[in-house]
């Protein structure tokens, strides 16, 4: 990370009071996620409606059994009514299974769409985003936040429709039986709704805090349990300290998990107790009407009504809990939408230019660059042309903008002034495929996947044959070493290639780039971290790679750039000098001073 780069923060307003007006819009946005599956959801709706209608029929059949079939001794009618009750139970179960199958499939497809959308968005984000964001934070958004939505998108939405339909159908049936008892049953419903909404808001707030803590813990795990993190922790004797730090992070998560689980639990339990006690209230109310001489309620009607009321209890409580769950899930959706709403600064033009044949001429035309408006300029007025097939070396002190300049060519960053061209075309006008085919990068920090040697090389060219892979490895002078391994090209390289030495990893990276065969090559201090003997072997591989290509070399060791066609010396983001090695030495300026520094390093003071 560059010292003048600001730390990335999520877009403001997602978790503030100012966001109070956002939930309706966010709910509409969530509903749009289900739009591609509206046909299947319509089938679910039909199944839900059919299930609700069938389920409320059973109490009416029960009433007829108690008020007609049994008192009148009509055994035939009794048999038919009993079979009807059995049939309603079977139909309700079948409808429920089909409903669960379809809704779960739709929910999992929505989860897949969300994960893919977030990953695609992150793939499009500029390099600056990843230099400012902890890897664990990114992983947590995809794993924990989207994973936390699973219950909502797979069952909560369907549960909401199912329970709402069941409640409406049951209330209508209760009104048909006795409107007075129905009014008594529903008197406290507004209070219950108000309580559930308050509990939902409380859980949403705690869920936001919990997900942030989970992201922080994931970042800690990613950093400290990587190969580099383990090596650093053990060699510095800080393993116990890291363990203690993780335990503290985990302890904070424990507190938030308990608070999230218990938020509003007593209030929701009170609702459950009251609703469970309602049958007793109904029996009491029916008894009062009978004792007062008012229109009596038949035993069959009373039993059917209480059966409906008990049937109302489960979907009503579930409906209130679903409301709480949806409020909680809004916090997760907000965190995902933060990523989906990030501005992608580097985009492909509407009508991009595609170069079929790339010569490789690179030109920096009065280029300015800064990471943002608050930081000062990193590059100012860079003006240099690199003819196709020639080499340019960029040297200078640490922080002078060398790597940044090279990253403007493949559009890892975009210029803030001037332009960079490839074969006379502004790189911002080219399609991404042209840039990917045109430019290959070999950097000091070689990245290898935890896969086989062959798979790592094929990342550059998925359809490469074994002969092409071996030829690239030979050119990079790494074939003999690979062939000496027990598994050869099937050898797993380990996380980030830690089963290979630094020089071996560099040569694997060079072989991968050779396989890609780009006309433009960027060497970003590719040998600066190697010992002299390894550097010589890698340099030979680089020489083979560079032959006939336009090459931009970012150099720390000036001995590697003496043969460059052009050398540019950057100082404070400006091109202080330009020329060949001999020309710059004759000027006895900044380049000559750097050469002298490399040849006569300052003595280290004695302790």
List each model region and its residues.
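An intracellular "coupling" helix at the cytosolic face of ABC transporter transmembrane type-1 domains
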Residues: 31, 35, 39, 127-128, ...
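Cytoplasmic coupling helices
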Residues: 101-120, 158-162, 185-226, 240, ...
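Helix-loop-helix
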Residues: 70-79, 173-187, 263-334, 339-340
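Transmembrane helix-loop-helix hairpins at lipid-water interfaces of multipass membrane proteins
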Residues: 41-95, 102, 175-182, 280, ...
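Juxtamembrane helix-loop junctions of ABC transporter transmembrane domains
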Residues: 15-23, 46-47, 54-63, 67, ...
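Transmembrane helices of ABC transporter permease
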Residues: 36, 40-53, 155-209, 283-297, ...
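ABC-type nucleotide-binding domain
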Residues: 348-349, 355-607
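Membrane-integrated ABC transporters
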Residues: 1-55, 70, 74-81, 99-103, ...
């Amino acid at each position: 990370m560059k010292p003048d780069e600001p730390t990335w923060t999520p877009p403001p307003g997602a978790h503030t009071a100012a966001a109070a007006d956002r939930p309706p819009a966010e709910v509409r946005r969530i509903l749009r996620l289900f739009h591609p599956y509206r046909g299947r959801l319509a089938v679910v709706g039909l199944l839900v409606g059919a299930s609700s209608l069938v389920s409320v029929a059973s109490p009416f059949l029960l009433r007829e059994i108690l008020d007609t079939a049994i008192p009148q001794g009509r055994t035939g009618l009794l048999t038919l009514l009993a079979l009807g009750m059995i049939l309603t139970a079977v139909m309700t179960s079948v409808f429920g299974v089909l409903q669960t199958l379809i809704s779960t499939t739709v929910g999992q497809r929505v989860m897949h769409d969300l994960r893919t959308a977030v990953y695609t968005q992150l793939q499009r984000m500029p390099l600056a985003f990843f230099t400012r964001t902890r890897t664990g934070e990114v992983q947590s958004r995809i794993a924990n936040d989207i994973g936390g939505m699973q219950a909502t998108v797979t069952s909560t939405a369907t549960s909401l429709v199912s329970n709402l339909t069941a409640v409406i159908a049951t209330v209508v049936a209760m009104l048909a039986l006795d409107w007075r008892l129905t009014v008594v049953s529903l008197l406290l419903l507004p209070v219950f709704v108000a309580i559930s909404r308050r509990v939902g808001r409380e859980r949403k707030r705690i869920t936001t805090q919990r997900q942030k803590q989970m992201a922080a813990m994931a970042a800690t795990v990613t950093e400290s349990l990587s190969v580099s993190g383990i090596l650093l922790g053990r060699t510095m004797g800080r393993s116990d300290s890291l363990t203690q730090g993780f335990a503290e992070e985990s302890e904070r998560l424990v507190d938030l998990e308990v608070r999230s689980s218990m938020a509003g639990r007593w209030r929701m339990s009170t609702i459950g107790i009251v609703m469970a006690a309602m049958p007793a209230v109904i029996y009491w109310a029916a008894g009062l009407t009978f004792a007062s001489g008012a229109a009596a309620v038949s035993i069959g009607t009373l039993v059917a009504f209480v059966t409906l009321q008990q049937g109302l209890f489960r979907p009503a409580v579930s409906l209130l809990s679903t409301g709480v769950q949806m409020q909680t899930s809004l916090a997760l959706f907000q965190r995902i939408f933060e990523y989906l709403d990030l501005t992608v600064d580097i985009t492909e033009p509407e009508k991009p230019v595609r170069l079929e044949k790339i010569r490789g001429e690179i030109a920096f035309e009065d280029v300015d660059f800064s990471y943002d408006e608050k930081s000062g300029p990193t590059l100012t007025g860079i003006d240099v042309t690199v003819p196709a097939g020639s080499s340019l070396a960029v040297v200078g002190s640490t922080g002078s903008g060398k790597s940044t300049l090279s990253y403007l060519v493949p559009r890892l960053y975009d210029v803030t002034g001037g332009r960079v061209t490839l074969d006379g075309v502004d790189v911002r006008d080219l399609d991404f495929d042209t840039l990917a085919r045109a430019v290959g990068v070999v950097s000091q920090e070689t990245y290898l996947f935890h896969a086989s040697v062959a798979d790592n090389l094929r990342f550059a060219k998925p359809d490469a044959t074994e002969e092409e892979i071996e030829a690239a490895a030979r050119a990079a002078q790494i074939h003999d070493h690979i062939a000496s391994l027990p598994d050869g090209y099937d050898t797993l390289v380990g996380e980030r290639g830690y089963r290979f030495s630094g020089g071996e990893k560099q040569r694997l990276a060079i072989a991968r780039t050779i396989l890609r065969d780009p006309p433009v090559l960027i060497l970003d201090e590719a040998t600066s971290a190697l010992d002299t003997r390894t550097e010589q072997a890698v340099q030979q591989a680089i020489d083979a790679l560079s032959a006939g290509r336009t090459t931009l070399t970012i150099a720390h060791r000036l001995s590697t750039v003496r043969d460059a066609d052009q050398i540019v010396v950057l100082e404070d983001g400006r091109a202080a000098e330009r020329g060949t090695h001999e020309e710059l030495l004759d000027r006895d300026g900044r380049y000559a001073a750097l050469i002298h520094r490399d040849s006569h390093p300052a003595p280290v003071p004695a302790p």
